[in-house]
Structure formats: structure tokens, C-alpha cells
Amino acid sequence: AYFKIHKFNSVSSFTNSRLWQQCNFKYKYFAKVDYKSCFNSIYTHTYKWIIERNTVDSKEAKNSNLFIIIDRVLQNINGKSSNGVIVGPEFSRMIAEILLQHIDKEILENLQIKGLSMPKDFRVFRYVDDIYIFANTPIITEAIVKTIVSTAQKYLLHLNELKYYTAETPV
């Protein structure tokens, strides 16, 4: 993942780590956001879009059965619905991770276009649907959040406004 939490197997091991402390020291601002009802909001046809965009020859993607298979499997385990991925099975988490990594990559590319670079201006970490942002200024923090919002909306995902948190780092 572009915004992965490295070798940590839980959020608490990340927030208790040296890396967390280093980010609190290096960056003055922190924000936490998460995707609202992440698994329930995943639209299964999204995988067709991802595969077609990441295939050099889009004709190959249209002739490929991969996206059809993924879509059917997701619908079959979710009562034939194309809206939402059932929470629980490891397969669902892996499938969600494919989408979220694709979104991570697109967010990073959009931030680079805006002249922001990681780790000079910011660091972003994502653990499943929770996103942790460290930045040098509140303007950068807001630009990152806006970029996450606009990118995620293209894939029918939204941030949970009730869980949006921002503060100055304690160090």
C-alpha cells in the first residue's frame, strides 16, 4: 500500500511505535479520518474500472473475465447485491484492500500534482479504512483531506465526518 502502516499488525502497535513518535516530532499537525461504512459502500463493479484503467490495452480488459469473476464472487457472497462487500471474510478484506490501495495511489499522484511530496511535506498511513495524516501545516492537512474526499467519491466512498479529528502534534 502507498499509505500502509508498515509492519504493524494493529493500530495500537502503530500508535505505540517509534515511527509514530518520529512523525509526532517531525510534523506539527495531525488528522485522522476514516471511510464511512467502508465495506458496505464498496460497489462491486468498481473492480472493472480499476482493471480497465490499469491494463495497458483496454481491449484486453474488456475481453478478460477477471473483473466478471471478481464481481460475481462478491455478489454471490453478498446475496446477489452489487452494493457492499460482506464484512468478515478475509477474502472481503483482500478485495477491499485492492480498491483502497488503488485509491491510495491516486491520492498520492494527485498530491504530487499539487506540489506536495511525501515525506517532506506529509506522511499518510492507512490501516484498513482508518487514515492517519501528519503534515507540516494545517493547509497541507486540509489539502490532503480534500484530495482523499474527491478521489474516494469517484469510487462511491465517503469520509465519516463524525470521525474527522485534527490537532497539533503533542511534541
Spans of features found by a protein language model:
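Polymerase palm active-site segment centered on the conserved acidic dipeptide of motif C
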Residues: P138-V171
